[in-house]
Amino acid sequence: MFAEIQIQDKDRMGTAGKVIKCKAAVLWEQKQPFSIEEIEVAPPKTKEVRIKILATGICRTDDHVIKGTMVSKFPVIVGHEATGIVESIGEGVTTVKPGDKVIPLFLPQCRECNACRNPDGNLCIRSDITGRGVLADGTTRFTCKGKPVHHFMNTSTFTEYTVVDESSVAKIDDAAPPEKVCLIGCGFSTGYGAAVKTGKVKPGSTCVVFGLGGVGLSVIMGCKSAGASRIIGIDLNKDKFEKAMAVGATECISPKDSTKPISEVLSEMTGNNVGYTFEVIGHLETMIDALASCHMNYGTSVVVGVPPSAKMLTYDPMLLFTGRTWKGCVFGGLKSRDDVPKLVTEFLAKKFDLDQLITHVLPFKKISEGFELLNSGQSIRTVLTF
């Protein structure tokens, strides 16, 4: 309510069409800490939307930019998992209006390109997978100290205000709590969708999830929702087992507990009946382990974790020749503008519990503390509020 009143007040002051000054966490270069700066956010141009951010999650992908393992131009405002309210719209915008509660989408859905028109596709041609760091017209809406600041993954949510393309925003139910449903903007949807959309887990099946971070836990929740009868969680850190069991895992194991290959351990545990495996770590070795662990003839293995850049994978092609299916997905294979509002509605109907994934809620000014929690392994998801 407070944020909505604030939007109304700003409308009365006539911010639409004008530059807004606000606080943002700017990364001036890689491997350097965030700097909380006053930035200028330009008005939205044609088919663009300016959003007041209410809450934003800290995701491992953001940390990849800091560490230099993900391509980005600098300076940049990262962050891509958020909830906000539309402050103003550019010419030609028809799907949202000022005052609407929305989720910015790092994976756009233009509904016109081949991927958007294909029922099985979701990697929209407007996706910024190469780290261009600008909007559709090739420019940025952010300025700091007289210098242009780049966008990140079409979203840039570590700021009080951002500007996105209309194809990168989904209107959601106004009753949705922003500090919870922001996770639907990335982490939860990526894992949940990997199970229900990409993997197409069948009722009564056995699933194995490699990696029990926030996305891995979301995969477990998706497997449970799809009706899997057995869900095995795998992680080197046994401290993660309790939470995995709480969200739906039927058992958890650590590879360190056996000298046998993990695929052999799983075969013995299940009577050689693993239907689905999910690699949610991003390590080449575990991608192959996950593939080898599903049934050699009818098993499906899904790569969910972001693989390291500039690395090549070597594997025995017989793993596929016998009939296994090996798949990957971005955003769980979901069509962002279509599926995000549906997931918010399902959350409000208590189909799944996002509280299980949120371990910390901090004010935006403590963003660096949030990343310390991430890198020390103390958090699953930290949400920053404005």
From Swiss-Prot:
Keywords: Cytoplasm, Lipid metabolism, Metal-binding, NAD, Oxidoreductase, Zinc. Its cofactor is Zn(2+). Homodimer. InterPro entries: ADH-like_C, ADH-like_N, ADH_Zn_CS, GroES-like_sf, NAD(P)-bd_dom_sf. NAD(+) binds at residues 60-64, 211-216, 235, 240, 281-283, 304-306, 329-331, 381. Retinol oxidation is inhibited by the detergent Tween 80. Ethanol inhibits both all-trans-retinol and 9-cis-retinol oxidation. 13-cis-retinol is an effective competitive inhibitor of the 9-cis-retinol oxidation. All-trans-retinoic acid is a powerful inhibitor of all-trans-retinol oxidation. 13-cis-retinoic acid is a powerful inhibitor of all-trans-retinol oxidation. Cimetidine competitively inhibited ethanol oxidation. It is found in: Cytoplasm. Gene3D superfamilies: Medium-chain alcohol dehydrogenases, catalytic domain, NAD(P)-binding Rossmann-like Domain. Catalyzes the NAD-dependent oxidation of all-trans-retinol, alcohol, and omega-hydroxy fatty acids and their derivatives. Oxidizes preferentially all trans-retinol, all-trans-4-hydroxyretinol, 9-cis-retinol, 2-hexenol, and long chain omega-hydroxy fatty acids such as juniperic acid. In vitro can also catalyze the NADH-dependent reduction of all-trans-retinal and aldehydes and their derivatives. Reduces preferentially all trans-retinal, all-trans-4-oxoretinal and hexanal. Catalyzes in the oxidative direction with higher efficiency. The keyword Zinc applies. Zn(2+) 2 binds at residues 110, 113, 116, 124. SUPFAM superfamilies: GroES-like, NAD(P)-binding Rossmann-fold domains. GO terms for cellular component: cytosol; plasma membrane. Binds 2 Zn(2+) ions per subunit. This is All-trans-retinol dehydrogenase [NAD(+)] ADH7. It is an enzyme of class 1 (oxidoreductase). Its main location: cytoplasm. It comes from the Eukaryota. Its EC number is 1.1.1.105, 1.1.1.1, 1.1.1.66. One of its GO terms (biological process) is retinol metabolic process. The gene is ADH7. Preferentially expressed in stomach.
